[in-house]
Amino acid sequence: MSEDNRPLEEQLGNRAESPNTPESVREDNSKSQNNHLNQPSSTPQTPETTADNTFVESELLQDSQGIEKLLATLAEQIGSTQEGQEILGQLQPLLTNLIQQNESLLQTNQSLKDQLEEQNQQIDAAKRRYIGLAAEFDNFRKRTLREKEELEKQAKRKTLSELLTVVDNFERARLQIKPSNEGEGEIHKSYQGVYKNLVDSLKRLGVSAMRAEGEPFDPMYHEAMLREPTNDFPEGTVIEQLVRGYLLDDQVLRHAMVKVAAPKEPDSSETESTSESVSDVQQPTT
């Protein structure tokens, strides 16, 4: 078989190993082969960082530059002979095709980078929307919970306020009704049992009675119904509780209606005596 009929790869291989091949051509061939051997078999499946994309672009550019340099070196070294020109004529389309493939890969890589950047922006926007919606939902949940608790408190206060009227009636009946025989005593005792159960139930719900008598008058807890002049209590002291007040969880459920001490007015005789004394002192001398 003649040398011209052998495959191009075999001719190039033999020429690369021939002692007549210039040293620079053999070095370029060796570098080109090593570069291709050192290339990864495939590009990373999913580049996740800018550094990875930059590395891929750098490798592709180096391949293209290496192929162009190899082609220029071959043209310089063996292009002066007829046989070298024939080899270059067969080799140049292959190398040009490799360069075009590299350029196509560079364009594809850039397109993927743009798509990845766009997707990252969409993901960031979606994350911001999610965070905003989550915050709005949390605020809505808290507001709804507060409104629900407030409605429950209002309903509870209204119901308990109605029950306090029943408690007042039981207390008035206990003070006014005096059983005259055993039968009436049993009936009275049964009513008081109902009263006790009602009071115990109110305590379990957080209702407690105020202790107003002897305390300083406080408009936050007391409602003054009467004022009584007296010297037995300091002015502004609650001397009698007319209607019991109640608290619900340390908040006023019903104000206590009370009688408040007022300063006692001086007697008329004392006033006249004091006036005469003042007149005697102020009478001019002649």
Swiss-Prot record:
The keyword tRNA processing does not apply. GO terms for cellular component: cytoplasm. Residues 1-51, 260-286 are annotated as: Disordered. The keyword Ligase does not apply. It is found in: Cytoplasm. GO terms for molecular function: adenyl-nucleotide exchange factor activity; protein homodimerization activity; protein-folding chaperone binding; unfolded protein binding. Its main location: cytoplasm. It holds the Pfam family GrpE. Keywords: Chaperone, Cytoplasm, Stress response. Participates actively in the response to hyperosmotic and heat shock by preventing the aggregation of stress-denatured proteins, in association with DnaK and GrpE. It is the nucleotide exchange factor for DnaK and may function as a thermosensor. Unfolded proteins bind initially to DnaJ; upon interaction with the DnaJ-bound protein, DnaK hydrolyzes its bound ATP, resulting in the formation of a stable complex. GrpE releases ADP from DnaK; ATP binding to DnaK triggers the release of the substrate protein, thus completing the reaction cycle. Belongs to the GrpE family. Homodimer. This is Protein GrpE. It comes from Gloeothece citriformis (strain PCC 7424). The lineage of its organism: Bacteria, Bacillati, Cyanobacteriota, Cyanophyceae, Oscillatoriophycideae.
